[in-house]
Structures are given as structure tokens and as C-alpha cells.
Amino acid sequence: MKQLIFLLICLLSLLQYRLWLGDNNLSEYVLLQTQIAGQEQSNGKLVARNQILKEEIIDLKRGTEAIEERARNELGMVKEGETFYRVVGSELRERNPFNR
């Protein structure tokens, strides 16, 4: 009976050693769980970004309004015969050193 108890204590000690100090121990498990959570969050952001880009591509393929909007906003283009007016807010006028 004493030998059985000694054997069980040795087995329990070995298992405890592997749990706390061995390869793939408990602290590594917790570290990996936090890394997985961070990666899942990053993946979620990338999936949302990809969805926005897909919708933009579909919009650009279907019609000319999206192309016209990009040309106006990003390239500053205007239609033929159209007059472009830029309205400068009061904040920009106050910051402009040449407006005195």
C-alpha cells in the first residue's frame, strides 16, 4: 500500500512539473490565448476593411458616379463649363499669416 501511495505521489509530482514548468506549460497557454485574441481582433479589422474595398470595387465597376466622385475629390477635377468655388472657413483665415 505504501508503494502505491508513493507511486501516485511521484506521478502527481511529475504531472505538476509538466503543468507548471515543462514544455507547453500553463503560462505559455495563457500567453498563446492572449496572442490569439489579439490576432482575431486584427483579423476582424482586416475583414471589415476588405469588405469596404470590395464594395468600392463593385461600385467603380458598375457606374460612372463613383469614378467622377473620386476624380473630383482626389484629383480636383471639374467638368467642362463648370466653375469651382472653394469656401475657406474662418479657422483657415485666422491661421493664414498672409491674410493680415
Curated annotation (Swiss-Prot):
Main location: membrane
Domain of life: Bacteria
InterPro entries: Cell_div_FtsB, FtsL/DivIC
Subcellular location: Cell inner membrane
UniProt topology in membrane: Single-pass type II membrane protein
BP GO annotations: FtsZ-dependent cytokinesis
Record keywords, A-Z: Cell cycle, Cell division, Cell inner membrane, Cell membrane, Coiled coil, Membrane, Transmembrane, Transmembrane helix
Ranges in coiled-coil conformation: 49-73
Periplasmic face of the membrane: 22-100
UniProt KW Transmembrane keyword: yes
Topological domain ranges for the Cytoplasmic compartment: 1-3
Keyword Disulfide bond among UniProt keywords: no
Pfam families listed in its UniProt record: DivIC (PF04977)
A cellular component term, taken from the record's GO annotations: plasma membrane
Transmembrane parts of this sequence: 4-21
UniProt similarity note: Belongs to the FtsB family.
Subunit: Part of a complex composed of FtsB, FtsL and FtsQ.
Physiological role: Essential cell division protein. May link together the upstream cell division proteins, which are predominantly cytoplasmic, with the downstream cell division proteins, which are predominantly periplasmic.
Protein name: Cell division protein FtsB
Species, as recorded: Shewanella frigidimarina (strain NCIMB 400)
Native organism taxonomy: Bacteria, Pseudomonadati, Pseudomonadota, Gammaproteobacteria, Alteromonadales
